[in-house]
Amino acid sequence: MTETARSEASPANLVARLRAAGCAFAEEEAQILLAAAADAVSLERLVQRRVVGEPLEYVVGAVEFGGLRVSLMPGVFVPRQRSVLLVEIAAELAASAATIVDLCCGSGALGAVLATRLPGASIIAADIDPIATECAGVNLAGRGQVYLGDLFEALPQAMRGRIDLVVCNAPYVPTSAIAMMPPEARVHEPQATLDGGADGLDLLRRVAREAVPWMASSSHLVMEVGESQADTARQIFAAAGFAASIRRDDDRGAVAVVGTRDATDRA
């Protein structure tokens, strides 16, 4: 390696380039990029991708989520740390041998972490996007099954009435708000993984409505929403036949709506 190459690959130089590109956590990102690169040439390729705004998770091909390193590929929704709340709620509610579905699974991050926390559970993931299911297949290899299709239509019919818990991080950004999202998301992540329709709750309505015949007699549905959507989401769950409540994690800025059906509920 030449002196010039060494200088350009130095942590201080990387931090300066990342900071100039607007990376808020330049020091941390520099260390991640250095660890991910095999040599100076590959490092430069990674840095060039990052400084033009490509998400760090796409650049290095992975994200740390819920204590697990989750593989990621471009075109798949990047798991946000706030979504760990969904995992924590699901792990709290599910029995050790539960049948759990990670719906709109994306990378399969939720299901993969739940598989590590509930090793006796049966984990099933589903998504309509073949790139997402390919990625989820990597993360759930040896941990669960992955199906391609539209919401519950992806699942085997034998699962009807047998699901103990559905965890779902469906798109919930209102269409009009997409333009205000950070460029990393707005430009690089597929809009279909972000856009939840006029009020952001189109998919939530479908999931709540279509879930009931698939759920066991005592079961739970857990979905992420925005703070301003919480009350409407709770009402949607209630109208679909769930006892609904809202859970928050202020530290993560996370909000989830939780629906419960007990043994006396009927579809």
PLM region descriptions:
Residues R69, S122, G144-Q145, A243-S245:
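Conserved beta-strand segments of alpha/beta enzyme cores
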Residues T2-E44:
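A short N-terminal interaction module
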